UniProtKB/Swiss-Prot annotation:
GO cellular component, one term: cytoplasm
Phylogenetic placement of the source organism: Bacteria, Bacillati, Bacillota, Clostridia, Eubacteriales
Function: Ligates lysine onto the cytidine present at position 34 of the AUA codon-specific tRNA(Ile) that contains the anticodon CAU, in an ATP-dependent manner. Cytidine is converted to lysidine, thus changing the amino acid specificity of the tRNA from methionine to isoleucine.
Its EC number(s): 6.3.4.19
Record remark on domains: The N-terminal region contains the highly conserved SGGXDS motif, predicted to be a P-loop motif involved in ATP binding.
UniProt keyword list: ATP-binding, Cytoplasm, Ligase, Nucleotide-binding, tRNA processing
Name the record gives this protein: tRNA(Ile)-lysidine synthase
Enzyme category, top tier: ligase
Homology family: Belongs to the tRNA(Ile)-lysidine synthase family.
Listed InterPro entries: Lysidine-tRNA-synth_C, Rossmann-like_a/b/a_fold, TilS/TtcA_N, tRNA_Ile_lys_synt, tRNA_Ile_lys_synt_N
NCBIfam families the record matches: lysidine_TilS_C (TIGR02433), lysidine_TilS_N (TIGR02432)
Pfam families tied to this protein: ATP_bind_3, TilS_C
Catalytic activity: cytidine(34) in tRNA(Ile2) + L-lysine + ATP = lysidine(34) in tRNA(Ile2) + AMP + diphosphate + H(+)
Superkingdom of origin: Bacteria
Gene transcribed to yield this protein: tilS
């Protein structure tokens, strides 16, 4: 089995002579097997091996036993072990993310700290062939493209390596037994409460029994095949990108001729352009790419907001992708109601258009008895007579609102957390203010102060039309 791992390491150029390799060590069978194999191969590969363990403080006594086990194991193998305790529940609550996500972020943060402090070259993660199969099934069920079917990569960013991705879970368990390693077992892995656990414990055994007894190997071959196709496609993108795109003024101009390319190439060129202008890659979706393709046919000057301050602008058939300057993005866009009072009284309608904050339609009308208001979260009505001026802007430090039905104010930050609005989106949600007080978090909460009551005579209905002009 060691030869199998050595061959896999060499095939994927994971390790070179003299490398310092840090093993992410949970204490479970996979990471223990990985650590033991690399410790056995130290002299052959001419490498130094270290280990890092993060105690998430989630499983009480069991977590402490895991910690003690990895320290003893590393001592026996003469491997330096770094241990860190983190209150994952606390971090999860503070950041409004799952414990699983919080745990992953803290682990990788710890690995990065150790890498920098000790000049480590590689970080070895103990994913195996079964993990790969589970990942492909999960992604297929959620919906994915060919890139998603590549699954877990043997090497990522030239730093993160997965030397036992070639091994089946059964092989790993047998290795641990033969070498009397007695790894720790995380009991939560046996509970059918997570999607991955259900796939591991139910779906894969069912497929093996009824359709394909070698489904794990089959899915790993699929991942390998897709990885080769993606490599080829990406090479073509890298060749064509400099000819079809121009980098200028902190933006990317996609030439009109790029839109004549095959869709498989065009979508990836657009994706690369988005990645070039923004570091928040995980927020770009297929819909954003499709919107950019559609923008090409909407005429010069037309613009759409993508996400995280990234906008796309049609410039005579070319499409410019750029990140809106943060100062400009947060600049207050003020509309003083007194200046448009005559227009509202005459036409009962005013349209506001703004490149950054979006487009709005304001309609003033008499309140009809028994009138039912729209349930659309982008259409809200307020008491017109309570309003003297209107501001529309993005959030600022210390912003508060008195939510509908409440008597006291609440911080916008807390509302965003309660509404599970991602951090990266919060700075780009428009706010409508009346009399310098927040009346509406567009798409979300409205204020108690300006609500329509039985004493209301006139209402102002505001419709958010989106951020395309």
């Amino acid at each position: 089995m060691k030869k199998k791992v050595i061959d896999f390491i060499k095939e994927n150029s994971m390790i070179k002579s003299g490398d310092k390799v840090l093993v992410a060590l949970s204490g479970g069978p996979d990471s223990v097997c990985l650590l033991h194999i690399l410790s056995e191969l130290r002299e052959l590969l001419h490498i130094e091996v270290y280990a890092a363990h993060v105690n998430h403080c989630l499983r009480g006594e069991s977590a402490l036993k895991d910690e003690a086990y990895v320290e003893e194991l590393c001592k026996n193998l003469n491997i330096k072990c770094f241990v860190k305790r983190v209150d994952i529940n606390k971090i999860s609550e503070e950041q409004n993310i799952s414990t699983e996500m919080a745990g992953r972020e803290e682990r990788y943060k710890f690995f990065e700290e150790l890498k920098n402090e000790y000049s480590l070259d590689k970080i070895a993660i103990a994913h195996n062939a079964n993990d790969q199969a589970e990942t492909l099934i999960m992604r297929a069920l959620r919906g994915t493209g060919i890139e998603g079917l590549v699954g877990i990569k043997p090497v990522r960013d030239g730093i993160f390596i997965r030397p036992i991705l070639i091994l089946r879970r059964k092989e790993i368990e047998e290795y641990c037994e033969i070498n009397n390693l007695n790894p720790r077992i995380d009991e939560t892995n046996l509970e059918e409460i997570y999607s991955r656990n259900k796939i591991r414990l139910k779906a894969i055994p069912f497929i093996e029994d009824n359709f394909n007894p070698d489904i794990v190997a089959t899915l790993n071959r699929l991942a390998y095949s897709c990885s080769k196709d993606v490599e080829f496609i990406q090479e073509e993108v890298e060749k064509r990108f400099p000819k079809l795109c121009i980098k200028e003024n902190h933006s990317i101009l996609i030439k009109e001729e790029a839109f004549n390319e095959k869709e498989a190439l065009l979508t990836r060129i657009i994706k690369k352009a988005l990645f070039e202008v923004s570091s928040k890659h995980n927020n770009f979706e297929l819909k954003h790419i499709q919107d950019i393709i559609a923008l090409k046919d909407k005429g010069t000057g037309k613009q759409i907001n993508i996400t995280n301050g990234v906008i796309a602008l049609n410039e005579y058939g070319d499409i410019r992708i750029k990140l809106v300057d943060s100062k400009k993005a947060k600049e207050n866009k003020v509309l003083n109601l007194e200046n448009i009072k005559d227009e509202l009284d005459k036409n009962q309608k005013v349209v506001i258009e703004d490149d950054i904050l979006g487009n709005y339609e304001l309609i003033v009308e008499d309140l009809k008895k028994g009138e039912k208001f729209s349930k659309d979260r982008f259409i809200k009505s307020f008491d017109y007579d309570k309003i003297s001026n209107i501001d529309i802007r993005f959030r600022q430090n210390g912003d508060k609102i008195i939510p509908l039905g409440m008597k006291s104010s609440k911080k916008l930050k807390d509302i965003f957390i309660n509404n599970k609005i991602p951090k990266e989106e919060r700075d780009f949600i428009p706010l409508v203010l009346f009399n310098n007080e927040i009346a509406w978090i567009v798409g979300s909460n409205v204020s108690e102060t300006f609500k329509v009551t039985n004493k209301t005579k006139k209402v102002i209905k505001i419709t958010f039309k989106g951020k395309e002009n």
